[in-house]
Amino acid sequence: MPNETHKDDNLLEIKDLHVQYNTDDAVVYAVNGLNLSLKKGEKLGLVGETGAGKTTLALSILQLLPKKVGQIASGSIKYDGEELLGKPDSYMLGLRGRRISMIFQDPMTSLNPTKTVGEQVYEVLHLHFPNLSKDQKQDKVDRMLQLVGIPASRKGEYPHQFSGGMKQRIVIAMALIAEPELLLADEPTTALDVTIQAQILELMRRLKDEFNSAVVLITHDLGVVAEFCDNVSVIYAGRVVEHGTVEQIFASEEKHPYTAGLINCIPDLTRDEKRLKPIPGHMADPRHIPTGCCFADRCPHCMEKCRNTPPAMHEKDGHLILCHLYDTTKEAE
């Protein structure tokens, strides 16, 4: 969650993070003062539209931003109490895949078409556990493939011989073979049909319990979050605008207007309306940080102060909302 007092329980702690892309035309402000923390074993959903800053945040944690263009301008990223910003490449190489793994949106960006799937899972294990014997490594590879639902008899096949859902299973095997403490899953089910999507989410849930890993699930789909996560952080224009448990996000009458808009975009056969209600307008231009609330131009409740004054974060029972709507509530209390 964005503000957490029990620091010893936190596996990941991000404070006032600012990330930008320095292009030839302009500076793109992708993450703007973001705060986030994650406990050991927690399943956290990061929700927001394309361009909200979700993937940039994940790449920043692993220091995989595009070189020369991507830049962490300021802030802090601590992992298990240790500051990651400023760490040398050698340190981060040991961290990636071993303690923190990432599943990318397109499995083919992680798979080498010229190597068998067994070789690729084996290579990850060998990189982080070179002292294991070849037989020990092969046994672990076979077991991991079996855990993700791929028969060991197919480990000699190449990525193109597998369906999209099976490719994603292979990528999950590669991400978890070293038993990391944290898994960053970036839209792992986006390109899959509903049936396969449910299977992949169930697989991730089972493997999360098997290895006791914390998971950050990045998605634009609140329905997926409701199925998988314990807690949710809603991100808009590089900021956390709401954070709470799944129950708080969906059931509470108090919501950030952006969160309410996302929920209205979820198909629901019980509604009287025949059409979904998309959020009007577009994401704020990331080249220009607004003076007030970044959602003001799209908000149905926009007031004058929303355009001129940044909103404060309001908290109630751990439920956090960054919105002027709740200023009067707090003043009354």
Residue ranges: model-predicted function:
Residues D9-N10, K155, T245-E333:
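Short catalytic/signature loops enriched in Gly
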Residues I72-E83:
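Conserved ABC transporter NBD signature motif
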Residues E83, E123, D135-S153, A260-N264:
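Conserved ABC ATPase "signature" region
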Residues Y158-F162, M166:
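Conserved ABC ATPase signature
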Residues I177-E181:
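A short, proline-enriched helix->beta-strand linker immediately N-terminal to the Walker B motif
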Residues L184, P188, L192, I196-K274:
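P-loop NTP-binding/switch modules centered on Walker-like glycine-rich loops
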